[in-house]
From Swiss-Prot:
Coiled coil stretches, renumbered: none
Complex formation: The complex is composed of six subunits: RnfA, RnfB, RnfC, RnfD, RnfE and RnfG.
Source species taxonomy: Bacteria, Pseudomonadati, Pseudomonadota, Gammaproteobacteria, Vibrionales
NCBIfam families (UniProt xref): PRK05151.1, rnfA
Protein name: Ion-translocating oxidoreductase complex subunit A
Gene that specifies this protein: rnfA
Key words, A-Z: Cell inner membrane, Cell membrane, Electron transport, Membrane, Translocase, Transmembrane, Transmembrane helix, Transport
Species this chain originates from: Vibrio parahaemolyticus serotype O3:K6 (strain RIMD 2210633)
Amino acid sequence: MTEYVLLLVGTVLVNNFVLVKFLGLCPFMGVSKKLETAIGMGLATTFVLTLASVCAYLVESYILRPLGIEYLRTMSFILVIAVVVQFTEMVVHKTSPTLYRLLGIFLPLITTNCAVLGVALLNINENHNFIESIIYGFGAAVGFSLVLILFASMRERIAAADVPVPFKGASIAMITAGLMSLAFMGFTGLVK
């Protein structure tokens, strides 16, 4: 049980996919201008990442490895992710049309989010079992959502602040992301 908690804490805080592994930077910078959009994207990504991790583990364990076709891993994981994203898009469209409009093009772009494919591939490379795959996918998703929501909150405050002209826009966003990354480095010794 302790190793599961450590895996969860490690993926959320210590080995955060955005700030440490630099995966998922496109939605991190693109969707983080408004807090409500960031929360919606975080929830959608959490659902997709967790479900894609489980599906990727099952595809690897019950199809690719038994048939000896591991060389099709990346292509099959992309297909699995696309199916999960389409399912998520249908669910969001039916349950929250407002959120669906707010997310716009970013919802289908979860398919190309490198964090989703990265988590699926790292699950296999680190030889996680079924439970560990669920925890790893969920932890990565929670870490992504946490960073996305924190960054969106900061960007909303920065938008209202008096920022010097040369630092407006992407410049101050990158500086803020760097400072967030430094803050998360404080968790480095938490899990070995």
